[in-house]
Amino acid sequence: MASDELPVAAAATEEEDLVEILDEGSGRLDIARYVDHVRDLAAGAIATFEGTTRDSFEGRRVVELRYEAYGAMARRRLAAILREARAAHSLRRLAVAHRLGTVPAGEASVFVAASAVHRADAMEACRYVIDEVKASVPIWKKEVYDDGEVWKENREFLDRTTTDGTTASSPAPATRPAKGGGCCGRKVRVNES
């Protein structure tokens, strides 16, 4: 190494990536903490995505969102998504966090941060992570209006569903449609043992 070159610290490993699912009552996401986690002297860029609860949807006033999850599976899938992002992009550090329970209008429910030497890697990784979170993590959202409520379907998940009921994250074929209309009607299929 030349005398005028500074050593570059190694990028964080996947074991150092920050994955959090905050249980109901844990309060707001600590955005500064996640940004600080991905901060790295060798990084020339930090990209973030903050998903917030909007106050209206299709002319209806949104009061809050309510999130439920299969926690252990959601954590495993989030960690896998970060590994996939690392495999596809040259990254320094990653963080992803998602709230469960009630998230009032104006507050953040999900946050993604990625750092990289160059901005393109950080921005592309950040987009990849949030797209995969929406498409494949078992977290469900109920939108609560001032005049009712409805479970929301993720278009990203439905876009991946094939005509035989399989998805990118669930390769087992479906055998019959679920009974009744439910929140998803014919889009949900049940495998019989």
UniProtKB/Swiss-Prot annotation:
It catalyses: 2 [molybdopterin-synthase sulfur-carrier protein]-C-terminal-Gly-aminoethanethioate + cyclic pyranopterin phosphate + H2O = molybdopterin + 2 [molybdopterin-synthase sulfur-carrier protein]-C-terminal Gly-Gly + 2 H(+). GO terms for molecular function: molybdopterin synthase activity. Substrate binds at residues 118-119, 134, 141-143. SUPFAM superfamilies: Molybdopterin synthase subunit MoaE (SSF54690). It holds the Pfam family MoaE. GO terms for biological process: Mo-molybdopterin cofactor biosynthetic process. Residues 163-178 have a biased composition (Low complexity). Heterotetramer; composed of 2 small (MOCS2A) and 2 large (MOCS2B) subunits. PANTHER family: MOLYBDOPTERIN SYNTHASE RELATED (PTHR23404). This is Molybdopterin synthase catalytic subunit. It comes from Oryza sativa subsp. japonica (Rice).
